[in-house]
Regions:
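Long, contiguous binding/interaction regions
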Residues: 2-81
Length: 81
């Protein structure tokens, strides 16, 4: 069976997010001062062939650990769509 899986990768909460800071500054320059914080990450969509949903999640998790997310600076979440 084919599963659509999304991997959400975000900077660790305790680390500075320079992209988020740049976006926040830009938003404030546009007069959108009510926005308090911005964190910039990435969404990666995979199409995975697997025997069941648990196997698809395991494959996506392994791909995230090995390549798609940097464990030193980022965390990830796997979501089956």
């Amino acid at each position: 069976m084919i599963y659509q899986v999304q991997i959400k990768v975000m900077p660790l909460k305790d680390l500075l997010d320079p992209q988020g800071k740049a976006v926040l500054d830009g938003l404030h320059n546009l007069g959108l001062s009510g926005i308090q914080d911005v964190r910039v990450g990435k969404n990666i969509n995979l199409q995975i062939e697997a025997v069941d949903e648990a196997a698809a999640v395991a494959i996506a998790t392994e791909a995230s650990k090995q390549l798609l997310a940097n464990a030193v600076m980022e965390y990830f979440e796997v979501v089956v769509l």
